[in-house]
Amino acid sequence: MARKPASSQDFETTLVQLENIVTHLENGDLPLEEALKEFEQGVQLAKLGQERLQQAEQRIQILLQKTEDAPLNDYKGNDYEGNA
């Protein structure tokens, strides 16, 4: 039976659940009512996944904006020569 997706679950879990629903629906062996419930849950999971992707994109944009103000310096690494 279809369950309501938890809004706190991560993107990967959401994607796996959505893929499972798609597989069940593609098999075509579900009774109509169960197929409708699976479809409804799939729509909810797709929306949740889209929200997660949008949140990630916003976070990336914020991080990129912050780094525009602070240019990156070349990494020189640890200089162990001469420190022995």
Swiss-Prot record:
Its EC number is 3.1.11.6. Transmembrane segments: none annotated. Disulfide bonds: none annotated. Keywords: Cytoplasm, Exonuclease, Hydrolase, Nuclease. One of its GO terms (molecular function) is exodeoxyribonuclease VII activity. Bidirectionally degrades single-stranded DNA into large acid-insoluble oligonucleotides, which are then degraded further into small acid-soluble oligonucleotides. This is Exodeoxyribonuclease 7 small subunit.
